[in-house]
Curated annotation (Swiss-Prot):
This is Ubiquitin-ribosomal protein eS31 fusion protein. Ubiquitin is synthesized as a polyubiquitin precursor with exact head to tail repeats, the number of repeats differ between species. In some species there is a final amino-acid after the last repeat. Some ubiquitin genes contain a single copy of ubiquitin fused to a ribosomal protein (either eL40 or eS31). There is a cross-link at G76 (Glycyl lysine isopeptide (Gly-Lys) (interchain with K-? in acceptor proteins)). There is a cross-link at K6, K11, K27, K29, K33, K48, K63 (Glycyl lysine isopeptide (Lys-Gly) (interchain with G-Cter in ubiquitin)). SMART domains: Ribosomal_S27, UBQ. The gene is rps27a. The record marks H68 as: Essential for function. Disulfide bonds: none annotated. The lineage of its organism: Eukaryota, Metazoa, Chordata, Craniata, Vertebrata. Residues 1-76 form the Ubiquitin-like domain. One of its GO terms (molecular function) is structural constituent of ribosome. InterPro entries: Ribosomal_eS31, Ribosomal_eS31_euk-type_sf, Ribosomal_zn-bd, Ubiquitin-like_dom, Ubiquitin-like_domsf, Ubiquitin_CS, Ubiquitin_dom, Ubiquitin_ubiquitin-like. The record marks R54, R72 as: Interacts with activating enzyme. Keywords: Cytoplasm, Isopeptide bond, Metal-binding, Nucleus, Ribonucleoprotein, Ribosomal protein, Ubl conjugation, Zinc, Zinc-finger.
Length: 156
């Protein structure tokens, strides 16, 4: 019977084979026609790679079937060494969770009146509820970097 073998270049070659022929025999016939060594050949039929020890009838290859020939690639990517670091990995900063933190920002006097202890940032991008840090000489917003400095009275 006659089968077709399509190579990578798109060229189709015809082979005269028997259903009892092994895949090794087919590869040897391809070597005679194309000069490609059998150990570099991979034959594909119906999406499956054909194994050397089996016959054409095992794969249900009939007359005028087309096999696809691809070349076997040896090896793979170069192995890379695992990096070893001399210094330990730096820990990511974790914010401290303070329970009832809002109590730091307000104070209730004996009359029940609420006073703000910290200044709220007036910038539009910060919005309500963003307080400025109180330093000895300034108020500073950590979100928008707005700073208000205090005037120091000059000593004479």
């Amino acid at each position: 019977m006659q089968i077709f073998v399509k190579t990578l270049t798109g060229k189709t070659i015809t082979l005269e084979v028997e259903p009892s022929d092994t895949i090794e025999n087919v590869k040897a016939k391809i070597q005679d026609k194309e000069g490609i060594p059998p150990d570099q050949q991979r034959l594909i039929f119906a999406g499956k790679q054909l194994e050397d020890g089996r016959t054409l009838s095992d794969y249900n290859i009939q007359k005028e079937s087309t096999l696809h020939l691809v070349l076997r690639l040896r090896g793979g990517a170069k192995k890379r060494k695992k990096k070893s670091y001399t210094t330990p990995k730096k820990n990511k900063h974790k914010r401290k969770k303070v329970k009832l933190a809002v109590l730091k920002y307000y104070k209730v006097d004996e009359n029940g009146k609420i006073h703000r202890l910290r200044r709220e940032c007036p910038a539009d991008e910060c919005g309500a509820g963003v307080f400025m840090a109180s330093h000895f000489d300034r108020h500073y917003c950590g979100k928008c970097c707005l700073t208000y400095c205090f005037n120091k009275p000059e000593d004479k």
